[in-house]
């Protein structure tokens, strides 16, 4: 709880399957998640987790941006929900888009709307699949700031990412998947930074990512 866990992998190593199991969307998932002294099976995890997909076009459903965030909220207090949704949109530089149809936005703007919906949901576990894909550096920083605020609120965040700058800005723990298995996991310390540098240097040489140090 109150952690941002970065999940990195060699391409096709199973991170998306891992994410689907974590949030209870994979029917083959059999394990239990233990958190705060409680255990959650796959069905229970669906009620406490929210996943933002890499292709956010599959999870934008409403007629305008504001309603997209309201859709993920409990709806008990419409006035309070609307105020909170606008606050989130403002933090994501989207307040001027509230009445626009989500599908009319750019790819980066759609990504931020989906992230806003995750924030608005209030779920304990938030899973983001490449949340900065298509975003410029300024908006990456805004996403990072929002993720850090969620961490401070006690949320558990999982970031599937190949963005080293995002990892350095907000991750507190790292998990590396290779061959559909967890090869190593550790806090974001000096050893983790060394392992990250080696991973991204190799990936950059292979042309898989663009990394700056």
Regions inferred by a protein language model and the residue ranges of each:
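Helix-to-loop junction immediately C-terminal to a conserved catalytic motif
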Residues: 23
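Conserved ABC ATPase "signature" region
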Residues: 80-97
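Conserved ABC ATPase signature
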Residues: 101-105, 109
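Catalytic Walker B motif of ABC-type/P-loop ATPase nucleotide-binding domains
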Residues: 126-129
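H-loop/switch region of ABC-family ATPase nucleotide-binding domains
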Residues: 161-162
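A short, surface-exposed alpha-helical micro-motif characterized by mixed small hydrophobic
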Residues: 167-169
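Conserved beta-strand-loop-alpha-helix hinge in the C-terminal portion
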Residues: 181-204
């Amino acid at each position: 709880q109150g952690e941002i866990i970065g999940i990195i992998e060699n391409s096709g190593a199973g991170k998306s399957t891992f994410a689907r199991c974590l949030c209870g969307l994979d029917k083959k998932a059999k394990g239990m998640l233990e958190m705060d002294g409680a255990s959650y099976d796959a069905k229970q995890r669906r009620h406490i987790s929210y996943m933002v997909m890499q292709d956010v076009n599959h999870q934008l459903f409403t007629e305008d941006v504001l309603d997209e965030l309201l859709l993920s909220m409990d709806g008990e207090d419409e006035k309070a929900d609307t105020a909170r949704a606008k606050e989130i949109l403002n933090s994501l530089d989207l307040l001027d888009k509230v009445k626009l149809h989500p599908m009319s936005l750019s790819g980066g703007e759609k990504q931020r709307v989906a992230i806003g919906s995750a924030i608005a949901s209030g779920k304990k576990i938030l899973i983001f699949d490449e949340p900065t894909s298509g975003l410029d550096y300024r908006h990456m920083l805004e996403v990072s700031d929002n993720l850090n605020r969620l961490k401070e609120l006690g949320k558990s965040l999982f970031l599937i990412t190949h963005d080293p700058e995002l990892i350095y800005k907000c991750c507190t723990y790292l998990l590396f998947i290779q061959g559909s298995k967890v090869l190593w996991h550790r806090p974001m310390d000096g050893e983790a930074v060394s392992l990250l540098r080696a991973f991204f240097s190799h990936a950059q040489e292979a042309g898989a990512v663009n990394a700056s140090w």
